[in-house]
């Protein structure tokens, strides 16, 4: 799937500054299959406490609408996004990367992002793309799911749960290699390397280890897909994100002099560093091939 900053809306990327609360940078999904019912054993209970945002008189913005009904629980579950999560995923993305927009533009941005994710874009045969969500207030063991493990609508699993929880963080991981340097004189697409993008955590849930858990889950998926390494682009000015990735074992890869590597399409003054980490320790040469 080709990545676009906001899918369909004619908003100039140059007019949108990258926000330091997003962990890196953003990009967008697709996939297909049997019907199954998943019953998870309920082993614990949780309470829902309402902590509505203060809403001033007049029109409230999109983030305030979502924050009216948060499900609060100490448990964090990272899983693949489902169709029912789509609005909260769009809200988390836009509130992290495009804060400060008020009604009606904030709603337009969220609807645009939602359409881009649900409609999706085609991906090359044999490639994978998944949106992960960190959910507060719903245990994996408490969830009853209806739907298919394989069928997807855009970026989302076509499954519905009776107790879905509250999306606090998001991450996209794929093997499409749109933002990896091409290989050889024929500029072939690289294989065996997963790529992370769109890492964002809601402001109220930051500094709780959610981004780390999303990264861990992405690494596990990359291993499951048979990848030898995982990579990402990080805004050089986002020191918090840079430290996060370095603490998780990512290394900055120096671009060879004179080489032109693909980079995320954001505001022109944003500078990125490309970082990688081995997920298959049997292949110690995976990072050296980029030098």
UniProtKB/Swiss-Prot annotation:
Gene Ontology molecular function terms on file: N-acetyltransferase activity
EC number in record: 2.3.1.255, 2.3.1.48
Q: Does the keyword Transit peptide apply?
A: yes
Q: Where is the N-acetyltransferase domain?
A: 76-280
Q: In which tissues is it expressed?
A: Expressed in green tissues.
Keyword annotations for this protein? Acetylation, Chloroplast, Plastid, Transferase, Transit peptide
- What compartments host this protein? Plastid, Chloroplast
Q: Where on the chain is N6-acetyllysine found, per UniProt?
A: 217, 254, 265
> What is annotated as the active site?
245
Per the UniProt entry, what is one GO biological process?
A: N-terminal protein amino acid acetylation
Swiss-Prot/TrEMBL catalytic activity: an N-terminal L-alpha-aminoacyl-[protein] + acetyl-CoA = N-terminal N(alpha)-acetyl-L-alpha-aminoacyl-[protein] + CoA + H(+); L-lysyl-[protein] + acetyl-CoA = N(6)-acetyl-L-lysyl-[protein] + CoA + H(+); N-terminal L-alanyl-[protein] + acetyl-CoA = N-terminal N(alpha)-acetyl-L-alanyl-[protein] + CoA + H(+); N-terminal L-seryl-[protein] + acetyl-CoA = N-terminal N(alpha)-acetyl-L-seryl-[protein] + CoA + H(+)
How does the record describe the protein's post-translational processing? Autoacetylated at K-217, K-254 and K-265.
Q: Name one GO cellular component term.
A: chloroplast
Q: Which Pfam families match?
A: Acetyltransf_1
Amino-acid positions noted as binding acetyl-CoA in the UniProt annotation, renumbered to this chain: 199-201, 207-212, 238-240, 245
Q: Where is the transit peptide?
A: 1-61
Assembly state and interactors?
Oligomer.
Q: In which family does this protein belong, per the annotation?
A: Belongs to the acetyltransferase family. GNAT subfamily.
Described purpose of this protein according to its UniProt entry: Protein acetyltransferase with dual specificity triggering both N-alpha-acetylation (NTA), with a large spectrum of modified N-termini, including methionine, alanine, serine, threonine and to a lower extent glycine and valine as substrates, and epsilon-lysine acetylation (KA) of several plastid proteins.
Task: Indicate what this protein is called per its UniProt record.
Answer: GCN5-related N-acetyltransferase 4, chloroplastic
Q: Which gene encodes it?
A: GNAT4
